[in-house]
A protein has these predicted regions:
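Short, flexible active-site-adjacent loop segments at beta-strand->alpha-helix junctions, enriched
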Residues: 103, 265, 272
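Hydrophobic alpha-helical segments, chiefly the membrane-spanning helices
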Residues: 269-287
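Non-transmembrane, aqueous-exposed alpha-helical and coiled segments at domain scale
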Residues: 1-256, 260
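Conserved small/polar residues in nucleotide/adenosyl-binding loops
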Residues: 257-268, 277-278
Length: 287
């Protein structure tokens, strides 16, 4: 039976998860990001060379499949900045990186709204990273989000983008007294990524299901920490996604099992909670 492990922070992030993930990747077939966006950075130091990744799973330096699943909000410029960085370091990306068709996209208007809101709050600001994560998740919940798969029908994509940015610009101009964004410029820029991102896009839920059913190990890479969870963290000073272990299920898709013996099998066999104390990272395993 495969052992699938989830690594999450037990505090507010920066607990040293990257080190643990790098260690556990060596016994895994796939490493999966299931929530958050490019707001959290995982630092890896390999042979003295430091690399900070915000979107691509830390396992990309190893010979494993790396999955950005549906629970992640995706900023395409950051994704391709990371791909370029890794390629310059001689890291193979092709056939290893897999991105869900269902990832909601982050646009410049999400970032503009994020920063405008923080500015308007003044001394009561939450302290977001200003990268559009919150507004992108707001659109997802409000059923306004544009998904990665929508980009492959240019006409439909531009119609969706026009509606979305009309709403965003209305808020920017009329509520936050900020400048509107150019819809056409954003549309042209994002459509320029279509051919580049297409080789990486797939139904990651089915892909992970096939890996799981082959009894291979899956490593779920949590971002941020438990105390930043939108439901269970120090609300309202939290992030906009669920960061606890349970988020791995909704953030990746259902995992089915086919077995003849009357046994119980779980998607996640172990949870590793990372804790930072006095400049040292510790981790605890729960099965």
């Amino acid at each position: 039976m495969a052992n699938s492990i989830i690594v999450i922070g037990a505090q507010w992030g920066d607990e040293g998860k990257g080190k643990i993930i790098d260690l556990l990747t060596r016994q895994s077939t796939a490493v999966v990001r299931f929530q958050g966006g490019h707001n959290a950075g995982h630092t890896l130091v390999i042979e003295g060379d430091e690399t900070i990744l915000h979107l691509i799973p830390s396992g990309i330096f190893n010979d494993v499949d790396c999955v950005i699943a549906n629970g992640v909000v995706l900023h395409l410029p950051t994704l391709f900045d990371e791909i370029t960085l890794l390629q310059k370091k001689g890291v193979s990306i092709d056939h290893k990186l897999h991105i869900s068709t269902l990832c909601p996209l982050i646009f410049p208007s999400h970032i503009a709204l994020d920063n405008a809101k923080e500015k308007a709050l003044g001394s009561k600001a939450i302290g977001t990273t200003g990268r559009g994560i919150g507004p992108a998740y707001e659109d997802k919940v409000a059923r306004r989000a544009i998904h990665l798969s929508d980009m492959f029908d240019a006409e439909r994509f531009l119609e969706q983008l026009n509606r979305l940015m009309e709403f965003h610009n209305f808020l920017l101009v009329n509520y936050y007294k900020a400048k509107p964004l150019d819809v056409r410029a954003v549309g042209d820029e994002w459509l320029s990524y279509t051919d580049k991102v297409k080789p990486y896009v797939k139904d990651t839920a089915l892909f992970l299901d096939s890996i799981n059913n082959s009894n291979a190990n899956i490593l779920f890479e949590g971002a941020q920490g438990t105390m930043l969870d939108i439901d269970h963290g120090t609300y309202p000073y939290v992030t906009s996604s669920n960061t606890v272990a349970g988020a791995a299920s909704t953030g990746t898709g259902p995992v089915s099992y086919t077995h003849s013996e009357p046994t119980r099998r779980y998607a996640i066999s172990y949870a590793v909670f990372c804790l930072k104390k006095k400049n040292h990272s510790r981790f605890y395993e729960v099965s």
